[in-house]
Amino acid sequence: MTPATAAGLSRLSGVDVAALTDHNTVRNDPAFAEACEAYGISPLCGMELTTAEEIHMVCLFLNYEAAASFEKEVWSRRVHIKNRPEYFGHQLRMNADDEVLGEEDDLLPNATGWGLTEAYELVERHGGVCFPAHVDRDANGIIAVLGTFPADPPFGIAEFRDFGNIPSYTEQYPNLRGLFYTYGSDAHRPEAIPEQAAFTMEVPDDGTPAEAVFEVLRSHMRR
């Protein structure tokens, strides 16, 4: 799925604010942001970080400068294993017209050397927002990996793939109670993007829609 395709399908689904969260990189964010603006979507920059524990964590930033600075530190603790495109596909860097600019040689989704708490603190230092991705999924979900939802780091946000799972999960895992819940499709292919926006949020009228969403999330980042 290319940055421009993701932006275009997001517009068709009625999305007002969107972020591209590739595994452990933000290098397609400029192309995605440009495509979003062409489609009338307000963009955020993002990454789906894989922690040392193999937990996926959504990391969001207001601008590419902050995201790129964050990526630089993340990459200082990357595990360098060559990608095998025949198994994992090509990891392309593209522009907003879907033209290929380059390719990442090392496999991106691997665990980094950043532990969960360290990663949380790193995002904070770079002015971002972070929360555990797809907490109700077995693969790379925080609960599946740790066996519980921890009190530390003090996550105030949790992402679900299915909001119908919230009652059973909050009953079983007390630290999930009272958090701000977001929805994420975890779309890796075009057909996985919902036909209609599946999550809405009340935000103030100040600034751009992306700025408003970001500030709401920032206000909930700490439990």
List where the protein language model places each region.
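Ser/Thr-glycine-rich phosphate-binding loops at phosphate-binding pockets of nucleotides
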Residues: 19-22
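Active-site gating loops and adjacent loop-to-helix segments of metal-dependent hydrolytic enzymes
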Residues: 62-104, 147-148
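Alpha-helix-centered segments that form part of catalytic cores
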Residues: 90-126
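Charged catalytic cores and adjacent phosphate/nucleic-acid-binding surfaces used
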Residues: 1-15, 26-69, 121, 126-129, ...
